[in-house]
Amino acid sequence: MEEDDLNPAGKPLYRLYFKGLVTEEKEMLLAGFGVAICGDKDDLLFDLKVSIHDPTITLLEVELIALKSGLNQAVSLGINHISICCDHEYIFELVMGISTPKQESIALLLRDVQGIRKYLTSSIPVMLTQNQSNLAYDFAIEAISSEIIIDIPAQKETCNICLNDDINADQMFSVDKSGHMCCSECVKRHIEVRLLEGSLITCPHYRCNSLLTSVRCGNLLTPKLNKMWEQKTKDELIPVMDRVYCPNPRCSTLMSETELSGLNIGVRRCCVKCGEPFCVKCKVSWHNNLSCDEYKTLHPNPTENDGRLRDLANEKSWRQCSKCKHMIELSSGCISVVCRCGHTFCYQCGADAGDCFHGLGRDDLDLTQCCGSCCCFVFFLVIIAIVVTIILLVRRFS
């Protein structure tokens, strides 16, 4: 959410920065928070440092107490318009009303926060980017943490992906549904690879199928990756059987056949991106003054461009998806590939997933030989078990 879009014209807009801290030191739970209210130019107008003596308090509770205190002070100072600068995704969602608190203590604190906001003309929740969060630490958190009563050492975490054990706690990423944690850099690289593969963006943890969301991970990615993710989300909303691709090789934009049908009559369609007309039935550029049957009769063989594409595909060992006819090139990795239409097939032979034995360690897999080898191995294990049993019996009765 952009502040400039919601800032009333001619009205001064203030910023509220808040941060809660909880740590366990010498078998004692220490907690405290800092608050800073800044002007338009991020000049510090007010700061507050408070320690909390409660062995049962949680970090989320401390963060909300800090926010509540900051809003109270803003009202006391006569401020009417203020931005609530959040660096905690869940708190941002709570204040925006996107998420609902599960714990009663959090619900009570959130109720107080929303009640105080009613005394302000406008209070805009803003989710800080990583760079903005660093700036917030520079002129707000650092300005108050040096005077805060508790002394909290930098907490280090270990990433389960890269195994780096010297990562600051605020650089760790937690997957909402599974709770798995890894460093932000590993999450970023994982999402980038998944986007380039066209695969589902799941938790980076091994064999975890929990889905990641762009809202949760957007601040970790570049604008280009965010745009790719946004487009991928839109594409996934189109049913597989309703997908149609622009035949223009320089475009290949994915579209919904149902939506295109509502804009045109007959089989002539126009690409929503490049504008080139095409036949939705033949999946080729528009054949003027020819019906589909007439076009197929006059063009029984592939066009010159189709022939070039076929020769290039043979030369590069490309595979064509049997479902949507899209060409796919595998540069590296597993030979079981997933087309952008969702169809999975073997890159080596082109068969549908599960219909061949490629990728099992041998390309010339012989089932008879395989079964024979397995039987020999089992027989070998049985012989070893018998020998071990005989030795144990001899030792027992000798």
UniProtKB/Swiss-Prot annotation:
It is found in: Cell membrane; Vacuole membrane. Pathway: Protein modification; protein ubiquitination. GO terms for cellular component: plant-type vacuole membrane; plasma membrane. A zinc finger (IBR-type) spans 233-292. PROSITE patterns: TRIAD (PS51873). It is a single-pass membrane protein. It catalyses: [E2 ubiquitin-conjugating enzyme]-S-ubiquitinyl-L-cysteine + [acceptor protein]-L-lysine = [E2 ubiquitin-conjugating enzyme]-L-cysteine + [acceptor protein]-N(6)-ubiquitinyl-L-lysine. Binds 4 Zn(2+) ions per subunit. It comes from the Eukaryota. Zn(2+) 3 binds at C279, C282, H287, C292. Keywords: Abscisic acid signaling pathway, Cell membrane, Gibberellin signaling pathway, Membrane, Metal-binding, Repeat, Transferase, Transmembrane, Transmembrane helix, Ubl conjugation pathway, Vacuole, Zinc, Zinc-finger. Zn(2+) 5 binds at C346, C349, H358, C370. Residues 155-374 are annotated as: TRIAD supradomain. Disruption phenotype: Enhanced sensitivity to abscisic acid (ABA). Decreased seed longevity. The active site is at C334. SMART domains: IBR (SM00647). Pfam families: IBR, RVT_3. GO terms for molecular function: nucleic acid binding; RNA-DNA hybrid ribonuclease activity; ubiquitin protein ligase activity; zinc ion binding. SUPFAM superfamilies: RING/U-box. Zn(2+) 2 binds at C246, C251, C271, C274. GO terms for biological process: abscisic acid-activated signaling pathway; acquisition of seed longevity; gibberellic acid mediated signaling pathway; gibberellin mediated signaling pathway; negative regulation of abscisic acid-activated signaling pathway; protein polyubiquitination; seed maturation; ubiquitin-dependent protein catabolic process. Its cofactor is Zn(2+). Interacts with the PYL4 and PYR1 ABA receptors at the plasma membrane. PANTHER family: RBR FAMILY RING FINGER AND IBR DOMAIN-CONTAINING. This is E3 ubiquitin-protein ligase RSL1. It comes from Arabidopsis thaliana (Mouse-ear cress).
